[in-house]
């Protein structure tokens, strides 16, 4: 059974690497939001549960990688897969020790929990995959409904 599972994972990873990686889209307003935040002097970082190599490829494919000072993600050898571990890795890699200097923006429960585990405030975005109930239940500090709402909140 374990051998079949490993075969399945290998088939999925091969498909994902070949074409599945790009089977998504950028939400409307995201590029304008990133541009606006960067112009306002925000240092933008990525902490994703996707494999780091895949995250870089996706952001480059959609022309968004230039907005980010650092792109961090999970490892392919499973040594860093938990969201809290990825966030910690990004914070350490970027020399962020003062947690008040950073805020996590996410759309799922694991984003909120991983950020809280690292002492960060969290903005839950309602234009992603998670629901209001999921984000509130996980303990998000703020909720926004649009990329423009995120800019407004962060620039206060």
Regions found by a protein language model. Name each.
Residues 1-32, 40-42, 100:
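Metal-dependent phosphoesterase signature
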Residues 22, 65-69, 97:
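Conserved H-loop
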Residues 25-29, 50, 107, 127-130, ...:
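Short beta->alpha linker loops
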Residues 31-39, 91, 112-117:
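Surface-exposed amphipathic alpha-helices with a cationic face
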Residues 33-59:
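Substrate-recognition element of Asp-dependent hydrolases with the DxDx(T/V) motif
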Residues 65-80:
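A short, structured active-site edge motif that brings together acidic residues
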Residues 83-113:
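Conserved Lys-Pro-Asp/Glu-containing loop-to-beta segment of HAD-superfamily phosphomonoesterases
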């Amino acid at each position: 059974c374990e051998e079949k599972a490993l075969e399945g994972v290998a088939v999925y990873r091969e498909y994902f690497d070949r074409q599945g990686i790009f089977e998504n889209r950028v939400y409307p307003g995201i590029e304008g939001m990133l541009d606006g935040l960067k112009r306002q002097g925000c240092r933008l970082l990525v902490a994703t549960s996707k494999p780091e190599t895949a995250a870089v490829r996706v952001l480059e494919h959609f022309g968004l990688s230039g907005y980010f000072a650092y792109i961090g993600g999970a490892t392919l050898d499973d040594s860093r897969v938990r969201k809290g571990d990825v966030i910690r890795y990004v914070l350490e890699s970027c020399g962020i020790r003062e947690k008040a200097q950073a805020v996590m923006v996410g759309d799922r429960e694991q984003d909120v929990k991983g950020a809280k585990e690292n002492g960060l405030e969290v903005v839950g975005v309602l234009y992603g995959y998670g629901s209001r109930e999921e984000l509130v239940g996980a303990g998000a500090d703020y909720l926004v409904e649009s990329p423009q709402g995120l800019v407004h909140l962060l620039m206060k």
